[in-house]
From Swiss-Prot:
<protein>
    <recommendedName>
        <fullName>Actin-depolymerizing factor 11</fullName>
    </recommendedName>
</protein>
<comment type="similarity">
    <text>Belongs to the actin-binding proteins ADF family.</text>
</comment>
<dbReference type="InterPro" id="IPR002108">
    <property type="entry name" value="ADF-H"/>
</dbReference>
<feature type="domain" description="ADF-H">
    <location>
        <begin position="11"/>
        <end position="145"/>
    </location>
</feature>
<comment type="function">
    <text>Actin-depolymerizing protein. Severs actin filaments (F-actin) and binds to actin monomers.</text>
</comment>
<dbReference type="Pfam" id="PF00241">
    <property type="entry name" value="Cofilin_ADF"/>
</dbReference>
<dbReference type="InterPro" id="IPR029006">
    <property type="entry name" value="ADF-H/Gelsolin-like_dom_sf"/>
</dbReference>
<dbReference type="GO" id="GO:0051015">
    <property type="term" value="F:actin filament binding"/>
</dbReference>
<keyword id="KW-0009">Actin-binding</keyword>
<dbReference type="GO" id="GO:0015629">
    <property type="term" value="C:actin cytoskeleton"/>
</dbReference>
<dbReference type="GO" id="GO:0005737">
    <property type="term" value="C:cytoplasm"/>
</dbReference>
<dbReference type="GO" id="GO:0030042">
    <property type="term" value="P:actin filament depolymerization"/>
</dbReference>
<dbReference type="InterPro" id="IPR017904">
    <property type="entry name" value="ADF/Cofilin"/>
</dbReference>
Amino acid sequence: MAFVRSRANASSGIGVAAECKQTFLELQRKKSHRYVIFKIDDKCKEVVVEKTGSSTESFDDFMDSLPESDCRYAIYDFDFVTEENCQKSKIFFVAWSPSVSRIRAKMLYATSKERFRRELDGVHYEIQATDPSELDIELLRERAH
């Protein structure tokens, strides 16, 4: 197994594990996943993949995977049918920062977000949410159309 060093973010010092981009590409190109949840590792060194959801999982499964009291980054592959009856897909980047999460975690995720987001080439929309009401399936539907 080859180890690829992650590059650190100049503003926060947080790197991005190679598995993050690889897993994103699996979602984007192969449709292997419905969603991917990312977290900053316990040593605050890099962003890593925490969980993936299979292509058969629902939006509710995705929402259940987001912690109630801790920050995360997430990617969700939203499938929909247009008015012209064409099957489409849009990829959403979610910056999840619950209001009850620790201040330090909020700051760490906020300062690392742009660097991490740039690693994921092909994201269509970005959503910042602090509670489930700000991340609703109808919001995704509105943005995608």
